[in-house]
């Protein structure tokens, strides 16, 4: 349900001033138009992330080139679906995050069938919850015409974020039953229960957060699909996210970004875009109205990026958006 928790809401109040900030408007538009493209009950097996950068990708750009000089692939174009091996490019998705991937065997048909049956048990209720939560953002956007500046920024963020290759998926559209990721010394499975190496509650919480960090690399619809299958993980967030948890997750995502070889503008621009993407996807975990998590993202951006962005010419300047694109 989208009920609110008084104690959690008191932690980070969301007032009218927050709703009117450019940060919140970018987050709201990006979430609605670029992350969750399908309804919760219907998922396309096709990857929503583009599989690669363009032939001239970010890894080949000089430090002085602007975002507009990079030929970002359109996420829905046929050319952007072509797989390009970027394993040795330092600016690829895996290079930015320092992820070591190991693969295991595919799940058996019986196991997949059982997982699907369990998923359907609560899919309808989650779908209703998502529709109600999404309506909060839609209401915010419908009160007034969306600023073309906001649309241009959100679209550019999508171009930047979705240019990095996603975790490998099977040809049939399903995911391998066991994909082991190792990051910052933590190892875990992407499906099923989170293995706990120690009885310590703190260790368990750290592994859960690390798992979420990895799941955030999937497209929005794929992320929600995996969350539906992982009741154990979702059970840890029955009361929704707190800002402290949101901040920890976002901090860990950004810690995995390797900006070496990139200009400060590109590095900060990519990190800010990543925060927007992470915030949008975390709305799938929280049980409260979506604008609460977007409020978390607004606070995080204002505290960590907005001052620097304003000092360097604003969002359009940082992301390389021309006046023609805004108009």
From Swiss-Prot:
Its main location: cytoplasm. Keywords: Apoptosis, Cytoplasm, Membrane, Phosphoprotein. A motif (BH3) lies at residues 212-226. InterPro entries: Bcl-2-like_sf, Bcl2-like. Phosphorylated by MELK, leading to inhibit its pro-apoptotic function. GO terms for biological process: apoptotic process; positive regulation of extrinsic apoptotic signaling pathway; regulation of apoptotic process. GO terms for cellular component: cytosol; endomembrane system; intracellular membrane-bounded organelle; intracellular organelle; membrane. The keyword Cytoplasm applies. Belongs to the Bcl-2 family. Plays a role in apoptosis. This is Apoptosis facilitator Bcl-2-like protein 14. It comes from Homo sapiens.
């Amino acid at each position: 349900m989208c009920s609110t928790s008084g104690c959690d809401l008191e932690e980070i109040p969301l007032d009218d001033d927050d709703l009117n900030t450019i940060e919140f408007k970018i987050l709201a538009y990006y979430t609605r138009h670029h992350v969750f493209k399908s309804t919760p009950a219907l998922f396309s097996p096709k990857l929503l992330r583009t599989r690669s950068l363009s032939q001239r990708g970010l890894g080949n750009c000089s430090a002085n080139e602007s975002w507009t000089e990079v030929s970002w692939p359109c996420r829905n174009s046929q050319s952007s679906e072509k797989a390009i091996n970027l394993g040795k490019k330092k600016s690829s998705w895996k290079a930015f995050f320092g992820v070591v991937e190991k693969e295991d065997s595919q799940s058996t048909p019986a196991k997949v069938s059982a997982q699907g049956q369990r998923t359907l048990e609560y899919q309808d209720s989650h779908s209703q919850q998502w529709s109600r939560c999404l309506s909060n953002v839609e209401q915010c956007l419908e009160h007034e015409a969306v600023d073309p500046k906001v649309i241009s920024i959100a679209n550019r963020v999508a171009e930047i974020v979705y240019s990095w290759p996603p975790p490998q998926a099977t040809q049939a559209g399903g995911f391998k039953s066991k994909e082991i990721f190792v990051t910052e010394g933590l190892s875990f499975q992407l499906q099923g229960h989170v293995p706990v190496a120690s009885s310590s509650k703190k260790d368990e919480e750290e592994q859960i957060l690390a798992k979420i960090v990895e799941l955030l690399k999937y497209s929005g619809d794929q992320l929600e699909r995996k969350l539906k299958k992982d009741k154990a993980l979702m059970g840890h967030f029955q009361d929704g996210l707190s800002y402290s948890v949101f901040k920890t997750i976002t901090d860990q995502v950004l810690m995995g970004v390797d900006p070496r070889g990139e200009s400060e503008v590109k590095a900060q621009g990519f990190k800010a875009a990543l925060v927007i993407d992470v915030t949008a996807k975390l709305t799938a975990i929280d049980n409260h109205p979506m604008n609460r998590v977007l409020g978390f993202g607004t606070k995080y951006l204002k505290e960590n990026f907005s001052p620097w962005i304003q000092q360097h010419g604003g969002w359009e300047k940082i992301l390389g958006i021309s006046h023609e694109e805004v108009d």
